[in-house]
């Protein structure tokens, strides 16, 4: 594996660690909602920075990616309604960041009906950013790129576009 591939694999592992720690802290709390999620995400970031899983700067970047993915997961689940319960069933998704996000979604239930407009708008993913598994759609040519696990957003294989929307 080349150094660049090793770095990407390490970042994907760090992202999954952050997602799993966030999941653990959020589900351990009594409150459900966006504010509780933000607190759990910040605590997960602080903990993993303290134990040297990543630098403060790397952790901040991963935290932003996870927050974006969480917003997208919630928005997508709200759009799908009942179908989301089946599609985002944690036992169906296996391990990794997407499974952690799905578990949080399952336990949160209707709390997110009052989310801010941010989660209702389309969230843009850019080449090079970290994200969980899902289907990215190129904004330039509508080509679909399927990510089977956490990783970096690649350029579009059809048109080399760098901006995507995401579904699951």
Predicted regions and their residues:
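Amphipathic alpha-helical membrane/lipid-surface binding segments
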Residues: 4-119, 123
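Cys/His-clustered metal-coordination modules, chiefly Zn-binding fingers
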Residues: 99-168
């Amino acid at each position: 594996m080349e150094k660049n591939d090793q770095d990407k694999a390490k970042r994907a592992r760090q992202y999954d660690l952050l997602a799993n720690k966030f999941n653990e802290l959020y589900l351990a709390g009594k409150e459900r909602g966006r504010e509780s999620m933000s607190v759990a995400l910040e605590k997960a970031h602080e903990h993993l920075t303290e134990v040297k899983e990543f630098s403060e700067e790397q952790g901040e970047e991963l935290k932003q990616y996870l927050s974006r993915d969480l917003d997208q997961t919630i928005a997508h689940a709200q759009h799908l309604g009942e179908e989301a319960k089946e599609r985002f069933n944690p036992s169906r998704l296996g391990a990794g960041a997407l499974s952690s996000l799905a578990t949080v979604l399952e336990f949160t239930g209707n709390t997110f009906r009052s989310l801010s407009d941010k989660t209702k708008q389309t969230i843009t993913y850019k080449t090079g950013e970290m994200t969980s598994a899902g289907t990215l759609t190129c904004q330039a040519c509508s080509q679909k790129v399927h990510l089977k696990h956490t990783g970096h957003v690649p350029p579009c294989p059809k048109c080399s576009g760098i901006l995507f929307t995401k579904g699951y």
